Amino acid sequence: MSYYETIASRTEPKKQLPWVEKYRPQEIDHIISNRDIILSLKKFIESRTLPHLLFFGPSGSGKTSTIKCCAREIYGKYINYMILELNASNERGIETVRTKIKNFVSSKSSIFLPMGVRDIFKLVILDEIDSMTVEAQGMLRQTIEKNSGTTRFCLICNDIDKINIALQSRCASFRFSPLNELDMHGRLSDICRLEGVKYEKEAINSIIKISKGDMRSAINTLQHVNLVIGGSINTEDVYKISGHCMPEIVTDVFDILFSLNKNKTKSLKKSVNDIITIVTENNITIFNLLEELKNIVMESKFTTSQKIFLIDNFAKTEMYDSVNVDSNNILMILACLFVFVNNV
């Protein structure tokens, strides 16, 4: 069954589902990214040699969808009896391993399941395991070792460096990359067609740009903009409603910063006021402004040492924003950074 036939055949009230769930792949062949990983997993499933798995990579790259599709492939309609899914960011302590996981792996399969299904290993899916405490990871390693004969574990995280090395060594690790723009464009265009969303071509490109390979973020943004606008979506709608900066506006801010000179005190004050006006009128957050400025700085004519100085101090400026320093003061700090760089 094709991806779109699967979506059409689902029986739940689809209009009430968030699009990110409504259009989540249901079969392993429906996943559009990381094809090398998909091929490897299909071979494991076909040969019944699925190892413990560790999926890592950025958000929205298909990690959770992939293992759920694998589970459907293995268990079919009995999936709810054979898997335990936990989010480790909510249940990050050692008690989770002691109780929920141990109880699941030690329990016998339901007598109502067919013999062929009862003989298959169970599956524990642990999402966001990089949020788990060190102690909990240590106990999880022991649980995996003791129950390898009856249970497989799939550990999912964004940051593999936060995972116990001993735990990593017991799993087949797969790095998920952000989705490429072509795949994202195709899926978003198809969703627009199925939902009757009218849009300008550049609007989809803008969603892809601000999502940075995160398919979940892209679909959520598309649905959000569509709900607010209700008509044909354009690029300005996407940036305004998602809270991101229009490229032209960020370029205007950068041009002001690039021209700053520490010897022109009046010019500095006026320039900062101009930037404050732009940021306020366009409802731009400091975080998003800095994110876009990073990209422009990296493509600019600044020397390598100047770029390093600015990017390093952008990170410190983001910290000020995170502790609620007044945004006008942050913009003054930002201007002073460029004054310094322009006169080094």
Curated annotation (Swiss-Prot):
Keyword check for Chloroplast: no
Coiled-coil residues: none
Binding positions (ATP): G57, P58, S59, G60, S61, G62, K63, T64
One Pfam short name: RCF1-5-like_lid
GO MF entries: ATP binding; ATP hydrolysis activity; DNA clamp loader activity
Top-rank taxon: Viruses
Example of a GO biological process term: DNA-templated DNA replication
Keywords per UniProt: ATP-binding, DNA replication, Nucleotide-binding
Family indicated by similarity: Belongs to the activator 1 small subunits family. RfcS subfamily.
Stated role: Part of the RFC clamp loader complex which loads the PCNA sliding clamp onto DNA.
Protein name stated in the entry: Putative replication factor C small subunit L499
Organism, scientific name: Acanthamoeba polyphaga mimivirus (APMV)
